[in-house]
Amino acid sequence: MKTFKEFIKEDMVAGDSGGNPENISIGTTSGAVVNKGPEQIPKKKKEESKEKEE
């Protein structure tokens, strides 16, 4: 059985092949993901209690 690192090939997961139809059909990627997203997940705003409305 393969280990997790052997199973996952991150550089093959993403990439748009530069928009080239031949590269897309062959499966060639233009590179790995470089945008890791936000550094911190924004906190959810708390709902105001219904007691204040009354």
Swiss-Prot record:
It comes from the Viruses. Residues 20-32 have a biased composition (Polar residues). Residues 41-54 have a biased composition (Basic and acidic residues). Residues 13-54 are annotated as: Disordered. This is Uncharacterized 5.9 kDa protein in Gp58-sp intergenic region. It comes from Enterobacteria phage T4 (Bacteriophage T4). The lineage of its organism: Viruses, Duplodnaviria, Heunggongvirae, Uroviricota, Caudoviricetes. The gene is y01K.
